[in-house]
Amino acid sequence: DLYGGWESPEIIQDYVTYAKTLFENFGDKVKYWITLNEQNIFTSLGWLTAQHPPGKFDDQKTFYQVNHYAFMAHARAVLAYREMGGKGEIGASFAYVPSYALDCKPVNAMAKRDYDELKNFWWMDIYAYGRYPKAAMAYLKKKGYAPEILDEDMEILKKAAGEITFMGVNYYQSCVCEYNPMDGVTPYGTMNTTGVKGSAQELGMQGIYKNPVNPYLMTTDWDWTIDPMGLRFCCREITSRYGLPIVISENGLGAFDKKTEDDQIHDEYRIHYLEEHLKELGKAIEEGCEVLAYCTWSFTDLLSWLNGYQKRYGFVYVDREEEEGGTLNRYKKDSFYWYQGVIKSDGENLYKYCLLYTSP
């Protein structure tokens, strides 16, 4: 409140002070550090769609300025870690939604290229190289949205890029790209936050791209595509474009889980989702991708900013309902026992799928 949070460059030093405090107190114990988690998401929901604080709508200029300050906070935190003698792994985690062109029509192939530069590489290129994609920057300058950048900023970003040791990826879904005319859909249609399948509207940037439904993929109740191969696609793209090791910092399925009268939660859909994603991750490793870690989202059900407790991700069920309250007791789901078996077998159980790991 003092200076507007991420809207002010003052936050950069405050964030570095915070990071140094963590490095000083936990540096001898923590060997993997993520500076920022889903910077592209918290800034989009905060300054474009007004769904997260500070609740601003379509504030494009501030959105890109906020992101630049966040990049600087990330970079200076990375440099501080190394200056303090930190020898561990450090990077940022990006919510990656890989894209496929609708078809081989050139304008749709270009729509995919533009989408990737504006929605993916704008962040990952800074983390890995310390530079912004040229075509995307040219577009933002033309629109008047480009951030104000100090002379020394790019040098700091480039120096920090040389010190990160992995690219963090939060992967949930992929998308399709098609050319979007100037009078086409906007980025601000209805987002499915209710779990009513089919309620999400087609979104896009006018004159650039739109994201139609992928007819070849199933979706969750929240209209997120279920695309295990997309995870492999992400890893291959990062390996080829950046040459960095990868940490899968989030991957999981949000669903309407129900507890039976005998306190069982039969979430075979989550087991199948994770199994198929892990198999594709294994293929990515075989193809040369260096994957340092894989983290599922999440261990327990949790309170969502947008969906409350109705959208559940955990291996452990939390007895809490939207309207009726609950005991807050915890119950292990079938997926808990299945994943326990996967870990115990060092992944062998992925290739002999069955619901052996149910609660006793």
Model regions: which residues?
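Active-site region of glycoside hydrolase catalytic domains
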Residues: 1-353, 359
